[in-house]
């Protein structure tokens, strides 16, 4: 094949390579790869180590926020070393660097948070004062809202690292994204799931996204991997994230569901200690002409209402 392969940038973690490998196969097929073809001749995966992967002993908010998972990859995209990037959408900041766009979102995996423990089947069943491991401010606040007695243990690292810490007894239970467990072939270890209506996951959780330079957004192969229903749901969720100025210093959850042309959504934000919770629910009937704009507008409206009610109390200041 004379054409140069598409160069796909992705984090070098085990989970990132697993999910990026799935997208590599999809992209190669969209470019014409057949069952027996070498997909690397059509789409080449280029692992990039990010600052977020290198620094594992502190919360993201202490070292620069979600952008640390994307900065080096986006620099490679902007200077032409790669042609596109694969990310977990929940890791993407509310605003992107100039010149880059979220070009395609494939079908979403399970968006729920998974509860994993050797001593309890559900979060509600943990003993008084039990230790819950998470580095997510949202998961911390949602857990403390229903179980204020829990001790939150800061637990960063990849999935294997967190599971190993659980095995060593550093926590009595942990919360992880079910989508990541599924993509690693570990979906069976989950004890139970958090209800996404009672505890909405991070905006975009469970979805992957292909980021490109703005001038490449209409390339034909991108259209082949897009899922319209997921695209609209995450447009609403990211609209809420933007309205709430979501970051690693805010506990923001959003979950949108598309049924036909009706998009239903719930948005919530909590104070970091979980004591106060502010939430809004709403729906919109989408038209075929400007559905993405309408979906985002719903998220902006609900997120704006939550922000107006919660105010400065929603931001972790220390």
Curated annotation (Swiss-Prot):
Gene3D superfamilies linked: Periplasmic binding protein-like II (3.40.190.10), Porphobilinogen deaminase, C-terminal domain (3.30.160.40)
Q: What reaction does this enzyme carry out catalytically?
A: 4 porphobilinogen + H2O = hydroxymethylbilane + 4 NH4(+)
Please provide the Gene Ontology terms (biological process) for this protein: protoporphyrinogen IX biosynthetic process
* Parts of the chain that traverse the membrane: none
Q: Which GO terms describe its molecular function?
A: hydroxymethylbilane synthase activity
Which keywords does UniProt give here?
A: Porphyrin biosynthesis, Transferase
Q: Where is the signal peptide?
A: none
Question: Entry's Pfam families?
Answer: Porphobil_deam (PF01379), Porphobil_deamC (PF03900)
Which pathway does UniProt place it in?
Porphyrin-containing compound metabolism; protoporphyrin-IX biosynthesis; coproporphyrinogen-III from 5-aminolevulinate: step 2/4
Q: What does this protein do?
A: Tetrapolymerization of the monopyrrole PBG into the hydroxymethylbilane pre-uroporphyrinogen in several discrete steps.
**Family classification:** Belongs to the HMBS family.
Q: What further fact does the record state?
A: The porphobilinogen subunits are added to the dipyrromethane group.
- Please describe the quaternary structure of this protein: Monomer.
According to UniProt, the name of this protein is: Porphobilinogen deaminase
- Top-down, what is the taxonomic lineage of the species of origin? Bacteria, Pseudomonadati, Pseudomonadota, Alphaproteobacteria, Caulobacterales
Gene assigned in the entry: hemC
